[in-house]
């Protein structure tokens, strides 16, 4: 299973990556953030720099990453991601780990 963590620079993403590593997660951890110096990038197997969640092109970039990295599960970790992704949840059916908008 390949997991995509959104907003890799925040404490929630950092904690999620650390927890996955602690249990010897047998999959790929991919992270995204708009900040090229995001701390989560250094803990992930791969990473991508994307627009901010409320900017144009954000959803399209996520889909490019989903296809390129064979993502099975998306884990939004910031309030901006949660709002944007939940408003577009119909585009990600079966891949989201979050409640409905």
Please give the residue ranges for each predicted region.
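Extreme N-terminal starter segment of soluble prokaryotic enzymes
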Residues: 1-4
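Surface-exposed amphipathic alpha-helices with a cationic face
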Residues: 10-24, 66-67, 86-89
């Amino acid at each position: 299973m390949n997991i995509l963590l959104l907003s890799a620079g925040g404490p929630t993403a950092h904690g999620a990556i650390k927890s996955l590593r602690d249990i010897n997660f047998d999959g790929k951890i991919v992270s995204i953030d708009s900040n090229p110096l995001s701390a989560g990038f250094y803990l992930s197997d791969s990473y991508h720099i994307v627009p901010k969640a409320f900017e144009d092109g954000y959803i399209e970039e996520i889909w490019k990453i989903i296809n390129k990295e064979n993502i099975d599960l998306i884990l939004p970790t910031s309030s901006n991601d949660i709002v944007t992704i939940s408003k577009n949840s119909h585009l990600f059916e079966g891949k989201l780990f979050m409640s409905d908008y």
